[in-house]
Amino acid sequence: NFRCGYCHNPQFVDEEQIKNIRTENIPEEVFFKFLEKRKGKLEGVCISGGEPTIQADLLEFALKIKQAGFLVKLDTNGTKSLVLEKMIAEKAVDFFAMDIKTSLSRYEEIVGAGFSVEEIKKSKEIIQNSGLPYEFRTTAVKGKHTREVFEEIGEWLKGAETYFIQNFRNKKTLAEEYKKEEGFSEKELVEFKLLMKKYVKNCGIRM
């Protein structure tokens, strides 16, 4: 439900690519048979996307995974706070990872789609106060993420437990223009990390 130009999963956003995925769907029973065989080897399942909270059967699916004896990690962009509340109430999730695209004032520039800033703010609060382990994370893109932007993100996330800065990769993107962009150097990312450590308890880098 977002259209970030640098999205690394364009197959879940572009309509033509989505059609191809639909023809390759794995039946649910096949998925759960696979999990059954992996008991004792796998600890959990990550439900990602795209945006999993827009799927009507997410709660039911996550509960089935839990009932099968596995932990559930949910990746989200925070646009469906009510879904997050239901997942927590039903004990259908064990870990959250929420994408923080940019500072609140710059979201529209990045996501290129209709969204509610209030929903994103609410989701952040729900996750942070859920009592469950979580991480917030931002993919850093040159020209989009600067020291000023990270200062604003830091003010918003102040007191958060865990935050990761993920380096942009140009191998696969939604918009062609981003295929020409390069990621930040490790030195530049470390500078962002040091800045963010003023605001969050734990900050890491993913190259």
Task: Label each residue range with its predicted role.
Residues 50:
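Short, charge-patterned binding micro-sites
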